[in-house]
Every structure is written in C-alpha cells, then in structure tokens.
C-alpha cells in the first residue's frame, strides 16, 4: 500500500480496532468515500524480511502451525464482520453473514461426526470470532487464548 502521510492523516489512519485482516480494505473504503481514487497493481511485488510479518511465521511444529491457523481464522471472520458492520450497517452485515454462520455450524457438526477434532476446533473458533464481532466485543484473541481453547 502506498499513500502519502497527508492523505493518511485526512483519512484518519488505520482503524485501531482491527488487529489483523481488513485494515487495508477499511482504509481504502474510507478513502473512496472521501473522493480518493484507489488503484490496484497486480504485477507489483514486495519482498518481506524473514519471518517479520505476522503471516509468515516460520515454524515446523505442527501444534504451532494449527494454533496460528486457528488464530488467523478467528481474526479473519471477526475483522470481516466488523468491516461489513462499519460500512454497510449492522442489519445488512447480519443478513450477509447469516448463510456464513449456517455454513460454519454445519461444518462444526460435520467435523464432529467425522471425528476431525482439528477442523471442528477451527470452526468453533471461527464461530466464536464471528459471535464476538456481532456482540460488538473487541478483537482480543491472541495465541495464548487459542492454546487454551
């Protein structure tokens, strides 16, 4: 993402309620609402330093990998609902997410029947993230909380 500091300040910076996922989407949506044009260059590439960005943590430990996947899953759904609620209103966000919630509940039941504990756990955490956002509670789950579930 490239923008100048003046534009960043006019838009109001990043929404500090969003910990992970949708922070750029939210910023661009607010910029558009203020009349700024948004351009996406698909050919642009960046190189991240080794393991510094949260999403590229280097680990070979299976438990750590699963916990990170669960953490990402929780924050993704929390942030997505928060974004929709913020920009389209609570009612439309609920309508949009109702089929998603039904699908999550279905998958929890499916993986419980199949005895796939890892996927059942992931979808339970995803449901928890969605419900937390629906209840207007902050994005507060971290790796320690994921480990304890």
Show which residues each predicted segment covers:
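Flexible, glycine- and charge-enriched loops at secondary-structure boundaries
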Residues: 18-21, 66, 70-73, 120
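Active-site-adjacent helix/loop segment of glycosyltransferases
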Residues: 37-115
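Glycine-centered flexibility sites
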Residues: 12-13, 51, 129
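Generic recognition of well-ordered alpha-helical segments
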Residues: 27-30, 79, 83, 129
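Residue-level detector of alpha-helical recognition elements and their boundaries
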Residues: 22-23, 61, 95, 145
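Residue-level recognition of hydrophobic positions within alpha-helical transmembrane segments
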Residues: 5, 19-22, 76, 103, ...
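A short, conserved alpha-helix in the catalytic core of glycosyltransferases
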Residues: 1-47
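Terminal low-complexity segments of carbohydrate-biosynthetic enzymes
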Residues: 94-149
């Amino acid at each position: 993402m490239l923008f100048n500091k003046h534009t960043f300040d006019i838009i109001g910076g990043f929404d500090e309620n969003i910990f992970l996922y949708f922070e750029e989407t939210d910023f661009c949506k607010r910029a558009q609402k203020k009349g700024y044009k948004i351009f996406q260059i698909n050919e642009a590439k960046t190189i991240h330093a080794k393991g510094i960005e949260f999403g590229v943590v280097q680990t070979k430990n299976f438990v750590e990998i699963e916990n990170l996947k669960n953490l990402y899953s929780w924050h993704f759904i929390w942030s997505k609902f928060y974004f929709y609620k913020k920009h389209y209103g609570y009612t439309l966000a609920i309508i949009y997410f109702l089929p998603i919630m039904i699908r999550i509940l279905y998958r929890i039941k499916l993986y419980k029947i199949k005895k796939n504990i890892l996927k059942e756990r992931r979808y339970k955490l995803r449901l928890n993230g969605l419900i937390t956002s629906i209840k207007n509670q902050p994005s507060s789950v971290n790796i320690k909380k994921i480990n304890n579930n």
